[in-house]
């Protein structure tokens, strides 16, 4: 029964009826995620680095078997969770909501911005990277199943990473009405990266002192390209105190997806972007309805499949 996809079929049947009645515009989508507590006791857990005998009959329940099967099927990430539940190991130990940590899953909603109809629901562990990754899955599934492809996508800063913005702009031709995740402001009192002009034709930056920053073109492990100034240029520069006071020269890391990020930044002051920022509240209302009206702030079913079925049924 769990592998039948029945709840997905029911959800999509209801969505198809909503589309038939004209309740789905398909012009703009919004995406967000919210933590839902797992049915797992905070006291029944072990340290992620501890060895655990999952074959013990007292421990090897269905959620545990699902968890082990998922581990076998996935590629190792190289990181261990801080704490693992013995009753629902697929849930994630998190304190992101504030207060004491607890085991949780993330409910992910993709909604249409016209009247807030939920177009897709996905369940992930309570990790921001997985929440962002499932966005691609839901957008592609909605396009494949219903032929719906938005012109714009509204989301918060967590979805504004360079790979995500580039995927939306370059592969899907969707306007990212998303604040770009940017750490280039720099320290207070020093020139931010925006003070440097990028010369695309010559592939170099020009600093406020009119000196050039060059690159070897090598891509780092962070998917950035480093541009560096010449030490002699900086040594005699009158602006060094407000640029690189503690280093011989200035270094700028430029993302390989910077053009897509620049495009996303250019949308920030457009009327459509500002309207999307207001409309995005509809997805937050969906989560408020889930938790306050339906009272689903804690799951009843365990395991990823149980959590997915329960949240999909609630979204129907």
Task: Indicate residue ranges for each PLM-predicted region.
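Anion-binding and metal-coordination hotspots
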Residues: 1-316
